[in-house]
């Protein structure tokens, strides 16, 4: 029955969640076409491997589709959605398509407010080294694949599970990971209670023979554990965790020893710096051990891991300035990234360009955003990246800059456009500085343009 549908249309096919699914569907032999608002490297890659992609949305784009896949960011009045309704074409959310793919394999779902992409990628690296040949779908470009997805021949599908719209509850994995539970996605959840309920439901969806691998150091996770009725494996730095790390160093690289219920598994050398990445690696080890992978393969896989795009990614140098780019856009993520930057570059001046992401997040976490940039020597702040949201009165990049000045000593300047920032950078930067671009939107282009000499 499932083979009756062969032609799939994806609205917003270039998005981080959609593109990986599209790539796997193409590799499975489905005809995939889709649309996106702009051309991009992701769109070009999908075209290269066989997808037909339209720039812009139009009713004619769905003419021969047998099913339409969309993310929750796509509105019901989108012309392609309306055309599908008129033609009687089934419309399904992105997560439902991911759930169908997961049904073909033994599913592993990586969830949490922060660290999902890196943890998914680290898990995939271990499974690759162990010869498991997994199918992998993540939200960022994995350097080892040159893409954010691959179709494997093995039994496992390792996927990043998106809690932002509750869609991770569509999945039926055998093993779950929860890296942390923080307040976020206020455009969807009414408050922390709703977020907590979603994660509890997620953890209780694993079968009786499955497991939840969770960060025992995270207060949000610990708060929920009494409500979890399925098996739990905790990881972290605390001695009460089942899987524990003792850190030797986490500056340029991370070196740590792993213990399982008191027994030493071995020393890990990870190329990525930062305590948050050690936690991500512990989660990956926990999943691998659940799959019967040896500690030796875990250590080898982590040692070989080549990183993920936009996760403390070094983009180059210009005039003695080192340029680093990071996806961090929530105060907790930003704090971890700044701590890593200070650890890796302890004696260098840190200049940050930050593009806030979503009006709703900026409003809900305004106080945290105002305080998190204290470790920065100079902050250049630009306008909020809307991510399909409508503006909220009184919430802007400029109002955030004013708030930062009121509650902290951070040296902050607001710029309305990227061109203004690029024009200002030569007067701000000095040889030996580190320029860090931060945000989930388009801010990465500033580092690219600066290195290119624009």
Curated annotation (Swiss-Prot):
Its EC number is 6.3.2.8. The keyword Cell division applies. Disulfide bonds: none annotated. One of its GO terms (cellular component) is cytoplasm. It is found in: Cytoplasm. One of its GO terms (molecular function) is UDP-N-acetylmuramate-L-alanine ligase activity. Pathway: Cell wall biogenesis; peptidoglycan biosynthesis. ATP binds at residues 112-118. Keywords: ATP-binding, Cell cycle, Cell division, Cell shape, Cell wall biogenesis/degradation, Cytoplasm, Ligase, Nucleotide-binding, Peptidoglycan synthesis. InterPro entries: Mur-like_cat_sf, Mur_ligase_C, Mur_ligase_C_dom_sf, Mur_ligase_cen, Mur_ligase_N, MurCDEF_pg_biosynth, UDP-N-AcMur_Ala_ligase_MurC. It is an enzyme of class 6 (ligase). It catalyses: UDP-N-acetyl-alpha-D-muramate + L-alanine + ATP = UDP-N-acetyl-alpha-D-muramoyl-L-alanine + ADP + phosphate + H(+). Belongs to the MurCDEF family. Cell wall formation. This is UDP-N-acetylmuramate--L-alanine ligase. It comes from Nitratidesulfovibrio vulgaris (strain ATCC 29579 / DSM 644 / CCUG 34227 / NCIMB 8303 / VKM B-1760 / Hildenborough).
């Amino acid at each position: 029955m499932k083979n009756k549908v062969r032609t799939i249309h994806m609205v917003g096919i270039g998005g981080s969640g959609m593109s990986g699914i599209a790539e796997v569907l193409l590799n499975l032999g489905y005809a995939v076409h889709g649309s996106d608002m702009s051309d991009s490297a992701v769109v070009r890659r999908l075209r290269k491997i066989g997808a037909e992609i339209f720039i812009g949305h139009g009713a004619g784009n769905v003419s021969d589709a047998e099913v339409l896949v969309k993310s929750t960011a796509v509105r019901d009045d989108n012309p392609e959605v309306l055309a599908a309704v008129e033609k009687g074409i089934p419309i399904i959310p992105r997560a439902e398509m991911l759930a169908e793919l997961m049904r073909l394999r033994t599913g592993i779902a990586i969830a949490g407010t922060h660290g999902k992409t890196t943890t998914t990628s680290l898990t995939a690296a271990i499974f690759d080294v162990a010869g498991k040949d997994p199918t992998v779908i993540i939200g960022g470009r994995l350097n080892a694949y040159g893409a954010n997805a691959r179709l494997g021949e093995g039994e496992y599908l390792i996927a990043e599970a998106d809690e932002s719209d509750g869609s991770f509850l569509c999945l039926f994995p055998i093993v779950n990971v929860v890296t942390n539970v923080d307040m976020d996605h206020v455009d969807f959840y009414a408050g922390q209670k709703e977020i907590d309920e979603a994660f509890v439901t997620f953890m209780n969806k694993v079968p009786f023979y499955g497991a939840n691998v969770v960060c025992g150091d995270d207060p949000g996770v610990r708060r929920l554990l009494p409500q979890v009725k399925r098996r739990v494996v905790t990881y972290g730095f605390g001695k009460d965790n089942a899987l524990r790390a003792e850190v030797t160093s986490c500056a340029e690289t991370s070196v740590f020893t792993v213990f399982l219920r008191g027994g030493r598994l071995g020393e890990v050398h990870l190329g990525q710096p930062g305590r948050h990445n050690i936690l991500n690696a512990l989660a990956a080890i926990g999943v691998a051990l659940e799959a019967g992978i040896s500690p030796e393969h875990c250590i080898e896989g982590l040692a070989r891991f080549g990183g993920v795009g936009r996760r403390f990614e070094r983009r180059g140098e210009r005039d003695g300035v080192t340029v680093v780019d990071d996806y961090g856009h929530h105060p907790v993520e930003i704090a971890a990234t700044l701590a890593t930057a200070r650890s890796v570059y302890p004696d260098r001046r840190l200049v940050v360009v930050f593009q806030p992401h979503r009006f709703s997040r900026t409003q809900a976490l305004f106080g945290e955003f105002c305080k998190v940039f204290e470790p920065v020597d100079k902050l250049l702040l630009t306008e909020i990246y809307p991510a399909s949201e409508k503006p909220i009165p009184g919430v802007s990049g400029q109002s955030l800059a004013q708030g930062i000045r009121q509650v902290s000593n951070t040296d902050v300047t607001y710029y309305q456009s990227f061109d203004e920032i690029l024009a200002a950078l030569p007067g701000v930067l000095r040889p030996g500085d580190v320029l860090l671009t931060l945000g989930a939107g388009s801010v990465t282009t500033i580092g690219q343009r600066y290195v290119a000499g624009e």
